[in-house]
Swiss-Prot record:
Residues 82-143 form the S4 RNA-binding domain. It comes from Freesia sp. (strain Lejeune 1997). It comes from the Eukaryota. InterPro entries: Ribosomal_uS4 (IPR022801), Ribosomal_uS4_bac-type (IPR005709), Ribosomal_uS4_CS (IPR018079), Ribosomal_uS4_N (IPR001912), S4_RNA-bd (IPR002942), S4_RNA-bd_sf (IPR036986). Part of the 30S ribosomal subunit. Contacts protein S5. The interaction surface between S4 and S5 is involved in control of translational fidelity. This is Small ribosomal subunit protein uS4c. GO terms for biological process: ribosomal small subunit biogenesis; translation.
Length: 183
């Protein structure tokens, strides 16, 4: 993980740690001129590592975004941001996206009252995301919410009730609230 964030810059979904400022300067001195190919490759790798996708998954999302009307890049980011694991991360119910994936895989999360164990589940507006009624599930989410003070404000497409451990997807994400800076 640290090699990835040193090479690509801060990836908030992958880890909460930040690259040291000195290592960034060394990389820039060593690299020389950046070709268009290298820039596109780095941006693609940022997307992959931030959202925890394989190459094949990312290509499927690009294909879906290409078929839809509108800007392919914006639609791609909207598709990735509306994944269940990413929404749990944005709500503060998990410290990282891999942590959110684990919560979903271990069946701690309900969407509209049903257990969902697929991290790539595409959330829709008016979806209600809650924890399982088991004591262990509530304790896990409570620890995440208590231990992670919200550095950034909650995006306007999400609302959370931290006392009931419930989140709500209000609408599809707006482009200004996307957490990753992509060229």
């Amino acid at each position: 993980r640290f090699k990835k964030i040193r090479r690509l810059g801060a990836l908030p979904g992958l880890t909460s740690k930040r690259p040291r400022s000195g290592s960034d300067l060394k990389n820039q001195l060593r690299s020389g001129k950046r070709s268009q190919y290298r820039i596109r490759l780095e941006e693609k790798q940022k997307l992959r590592f931030h959202y925890g996708l394989t190459e094949r998954q990312l290509l499927k999302y690009v294909h879906i975004a290409g078929k839809a009307k509108g800007s392919t890049g914006q639609i791609l980011l909207q598709l990735l941001e509306m994944r269940l694991d990413n929404i749990l991360f944005r709500l503060g119910m998990a410290s990282t996206i891999p942590g959110a994936r684990q919560l979903v895989n271990h069946r701690h999360i309900l969407v509209n009252g049903r257990i969902v164990d697929i991290p790539s589940y595409r959330c829709k507006p008016r979806d209600i995301i809650t924890t399982n009624n088991k004591q262990r599930s509530k304790a896990l989410i409570q620890n995440f919410i208590a231990s992670s003070p919200r550095q950034e404000e909650l995006p306007n497409h999400l609302t959370i009730d931290p006392f009931q451990y419930k989140g709500l997807v209000n609408q599809i994400i707006d482009s200004k609230w996307i957490g990753l800076k992509i060229n």
